[in-house]
Amino acid sequence: MANTTFNGAVRSENGFKTVSKNATTGVYTDKAVMNSSGNLYTTAGGHLQYAAATGYGPSDLVIGKGGSQYGTANPWAESSTQLFPLGTKLIYGNNVYRYGLLGGTAVTAGKLVQHQAQDSDHLNMTATAAVSAGETDISVETGGTDLTLNEYADGYLWVNDVNGEGQTMRVKSNPAHDHSSDPSVVITTYDALVTALTTSSQLSLIHNPYSGMVIAPATETGAVMGATVIDMTADYYGWFTVSGPQALLTVGTLVLGNIAVRSGGTDGGVAPATDNVLTEIGEVMAVNANTEYSLIWMNIQ
C-alpha cells in the first residue's frame, strides 16, 4: 500500500504505524505508533514542522533529544551550520530550549544572553507611501545603515506611531539596501496589515531575537532570550535554555526559593531580587557562592 492515496476517512481498529525498512536486511522498524486509544508514540522524540508556505513563517517544535529527522536536537552540541529555523522550541525532560545563533563573541556556559541591540537608524522610520489594509509590502525610509539581503527575515516590523499604530508583523524578507543610493526600502511581511498606513505612519524594525545573540550586558540593551548550555563559539548555532533547571553565574548572595534576576553589575549573571526593576529569570533551587554557578529554575518563557 505504499504511496496509496485515500479519499475520505481512514479507520483502523488497532491503530496505525509508520515504519522504515532496512534495504539490506529487510527488517522493519517502528518509527511512530498511534494506538487504538489515540496515543502517539515515537521512537526518538518527534518534530512538528510547519512547512513554510507563502504567507506563513516557520513555527517548529521538537520533542525529545534527537527527536528530528532533519538534524540532531542536542542541547549539548553546537554547529557552524544552521540545522533548524531560529526560534525552534525543544522540549527535553523538564527543560525547554530555543534554537539560536550566537553573535560575533564567544560566550561560556551558564550565562544569560539577550537579542542583539536594535539599530537606531531603523527606529521611527516613515512610510514612503500609503499602504492599504491587506498589503504585505511596506516601503519605509531608513535613517541610515545599509541592509543586507534578508537581514530582518523572521524579525519584526511594527507601527509605533500615528495611523495603524500598535500593529506588529513578522518579516518575511527584505532586499539588499544601499542607503546612499536610495534611503527607501520595501519590507515584506508574512501577514497583511489590518489597518491602513499613511505617509505620517512611523515604523520600526528589529532582527529575529534569536539571531546574533550576545551575552546579556549589565547595562541592558535588550531582552533576555535564554542562557547558554555549553561554552559556545562565536557565530555558531545551538540551543539556549528558557525554562527548567539551569546553572547560572551567581552575582551576590542568592536565597533559596527566592527570585533571581538579571544582574545589573556583571555581564551574563543572575543576582538576588532587590528594588531595582530587572528581568526576573527564575527561582533559586540551590545556592552556590558569589562568582560560582547556582541552580535556577528558569522561567523566562
What are these regions (language model features)?
Residues N35-S36, L149-A153:
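A short, compositionally biased
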Residues A52-L149, D161-Q301:
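Extracellular receptor-binding modules and their adjoining Ser/Thr/Gly/Asp/Asn-rich linkers
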